């Protein structure tokens, strides 16, 4: 039996004690193979060399995968003790460089290799005991203690791969080639690459919480897309095919590169792929621990920026619209080839999961239908920056696994490489790296005129905008009902027996009341807000059906939230709502003819509230209602003091806002009923809330 070959665990079926045994074996095999990787380092001193100036030395990663278990087990409250607090702080956080020149120049007092190995032994013993003793029930889900165990195992398997890339960047004299990490012996010239058709189709991505396999948070949720037909290269781009770009001077010609790519190329002074070595008239290839004559029929390994430049060059040379595939297009291609998933395959359908070699292999060796290397050999760069699926939820035990990458600057790689194991080798895996990042990664090009859709799904992080998102669509607090929803319901009660034609939500913020008015029966609802931020979010909710936002929990700690119209039962009415940006004190003429105007907590934020009130009757139909709410929290930040309706003294006497409202509106409006108090709560942090009382008044146009 090849000790390198393992499969991730099916967590939903079988006998509990048998599952315990499977997880125990999986844990130890993961620890073993990770330590086997570090045996390729020739000297103890090698552990302290920086293979990549943007990364830590390998001693960090040797300790990191072990401390991860302890840190996550403590967060999950499975254990309440530390083995080595110093190590568990020092090895906790890696380098997440945001640029190729983002150097980490800090000095670290690293422990010895022997000290770290002794610590790893302690962790292994502790986790072994936990696996043997913790209560285990099936299925194993997000809340199970064994999910934390699986999290540690799969995390270590990620670093098995990323550390192998760092070892590959060490000086050759610092590493040793071991038989365990065997190199593919096959090499030669590649076949001519050609484009083959991939018919149009639909892809459905995303896991449900009950999925049988362990997954990282970005895999959950749901995404559906109709994919236009395209032509895809039969093979990954081989070294020989990429050599044409190098020899054509592609690395020196600005026209082929993106702005980001050219800046990287200029900084690194790159002339060819990182792992190519020019040796006189010949080329060598650096594998993980050896140098060999460059196999022309192995896939080239480059970053996204280089792959993109090649596609631009190749497109110009051929006259074809060539580019990298999107994530959806990659899945469409995989579906066409009908490839089984790990752990369900009997034998890997590619050079993946360490089931073939510990290196790349020829691009025409692993057939998948008419194509080759749909999975395995090297990862494949895509055009898609990673984004969260609808229904995405953060796992509380690892709340920063994915969200820092939802920035539009981390592109997805698909398919896995020869050393991708565990979760990395599954179809649902979604790993993304900065575009300059080096990995065992290459690419396949496609021919398509379809535009590349970039999902602008970053979380709203502006504190005020996020507070409004939570106030409109989030939880209730302290028994106080949702304020926009309450306003809408009161308006609908007031409109009983009246015409439900056209309503205006003036100062709509992020739109909840407008949607609720439409649900309540209005045939048309217009939402207006002066703030670009709020208008944009309301429009996004209408157009895309969901919002994502980050709320401050404590200090720099935030929580991430997603709300959807479908969950609120508002999807059927969104076509009856329209949002616009407008100044309430200077409305365009087209905004008129309303049966109801709701101006919730608006007047004390206007720069000219008297002007607003003096002209608002022109926007209402005769008999229409104007509903105002306000806490009358006048501030010169928003309104010059001479424009305040109340909240000041005149001739020594207090002037109240309600009295001024009556004075201003009475000539054209009739006050219906007595004013009433309407409470609302604004969440600032997990432990800080504002409780306010707005006064609600209802006015009927004469």
Segments from the language model and where they lie:
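Disulfide-stabilized, aromatic/cysteine-rich ligand-recognition loop
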Residues: 2-56, 63-67, 75-136, 147-171, ...
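A short acidic, Gly/Pro-enriched loop at the edge of an enzyme's catalytic core
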Residues: 585-597
């Amino acid at each position: 039996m090849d000790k390198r070959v393992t499969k991730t665990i099916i967590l939903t079926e079988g006998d509990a004690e048998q599952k315990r045994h499977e997880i125990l074996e999986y844990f130890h095999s993961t620890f073993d193979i990770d330590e086997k990787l570090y045996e390729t380092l020739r000297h103890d001193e090698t552990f302290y060399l920086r293979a990549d100036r943007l990364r830590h030395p390998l001693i960090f990663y040797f300790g990191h995968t072990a401390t991860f278990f302890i840190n996550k087990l403590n967060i999950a409250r499975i254990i309440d003790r530390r083995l080595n607090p110093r190590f568990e702080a020092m090895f906790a956080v890696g380098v997440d460089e945001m640029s190729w020149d983002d150097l980490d120049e800090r000095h670290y007092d690293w422990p010895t290799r022997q000290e770290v190995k002794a610590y790893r032994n302690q962790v292994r013993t502790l986790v072994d005991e936990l696996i043997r003793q913790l209560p285990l029930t099936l299925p194993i889900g997000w809340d199970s203690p064994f999910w934390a165990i699986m999290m540690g195992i799969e995390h270590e398997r990620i670093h098995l791969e990323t550390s192998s890339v760092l070892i590959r960047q060490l000086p050759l004299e610092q590493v040793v080639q071991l038989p365990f990490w065997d190199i593919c012996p096959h090499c030669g010239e590649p076949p001519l690459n050609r484009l083959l058709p991939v018919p149009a189709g639909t892809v459905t991505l995303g896991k449900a919480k009950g999925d049988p396999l362990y997954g990282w948070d970005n895999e959950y949720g749901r995404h559906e897309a109709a994919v236009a037909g395209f032509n895809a290269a039969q093979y990954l781009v081989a070294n020989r095919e990429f050599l044409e770009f190098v020899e054509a001077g592609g690395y020196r010609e600005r026209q082929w590169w993106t702005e980001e790519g050219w800046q990287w190329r200029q900084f690194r002074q790159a002339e060819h792929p990182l792992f190519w070595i020019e040796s006189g008239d010949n080329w060598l290839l650096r594998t993980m621990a050896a140098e060999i004559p460059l196999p022309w029929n192995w896939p080239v390994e480059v970053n996204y920026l280089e792959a993109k430049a090649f596609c631009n060059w190749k497109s110009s040379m051929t006259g074809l619209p060539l580019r990298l595939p999107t994530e959806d297009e990659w899945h469409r291609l995989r579906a066409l080839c009908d490839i089984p998933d790990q752990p369900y395959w009997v034998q890997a359908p590619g050079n993946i999961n360490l089931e073939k070699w510990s290196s790349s292999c020829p691009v025409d060796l692993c057939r998948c239908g008419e194509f080759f290397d749909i999975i395995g050999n090297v990862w494949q760069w895509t055009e898609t920056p990673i984004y969260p699926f609808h229904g995405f939820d953060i796992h509380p035990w690892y709340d920063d696994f994915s969200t820092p990458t939802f920035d539009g600057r981390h592109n997805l790689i698909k398919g896995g490489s020869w050393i991708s194991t565990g979760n990395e080798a599954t179809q649902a895996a979604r790993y993304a790296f900065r575009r300059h990042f080096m990995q065992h990664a290459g690419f396949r090009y496609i021919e398509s005129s379809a535009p590349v859709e970039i999902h602008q799904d970053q979380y709203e992080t502006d504190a005020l905008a996020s507070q409004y998102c939570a106030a409109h669509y989030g939880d209730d607090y302290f028994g106080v009902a949702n304020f926009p929803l309450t306003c809408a319901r009161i308006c609908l009660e007031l409109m009983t027996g009246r015409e439900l034609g056209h309503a205006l939500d003036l100062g709509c913020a992020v739109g909840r009341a407008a949607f609720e008015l439409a649900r309540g029966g209005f045939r048309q609802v217009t939402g207006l807000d002066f703030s670009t931020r709020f208008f944009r979010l309301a429009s996004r909710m209408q157009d895309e059906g969901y919002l994502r936002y980050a709320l401050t929990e404590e200090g720099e700690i935030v929580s991430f939230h997603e709300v959807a119209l479908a969950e609120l039962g508002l999807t059927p009415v969104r076509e009856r709502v329209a949002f616009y940006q407008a100044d309430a004190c200077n409305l365009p003429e087209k905004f008129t003819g309303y049966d109801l105007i709701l101006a919730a907590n608006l007047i004390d934020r206007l720069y000219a509230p008297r002007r607003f009130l003096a002209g608002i009757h022109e926007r209402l139909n005769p008999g229409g209602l104007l509903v105002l709410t306000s806490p009358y929290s006048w501030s010169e930040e928003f309104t010059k003091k001479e424009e305040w309706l109340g909240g000041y003294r005149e001739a020594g006497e207090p002037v109240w806002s309600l009295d001024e409202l009556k004075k201003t509106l009475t000539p054209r409006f009739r006050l219906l009923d007595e004013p009433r108090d309407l409470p609302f709560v604004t969440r600032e942090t997990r432990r800080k809330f504002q409780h306010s009382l707005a006064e609600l008044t209802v006015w009927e146009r004469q």
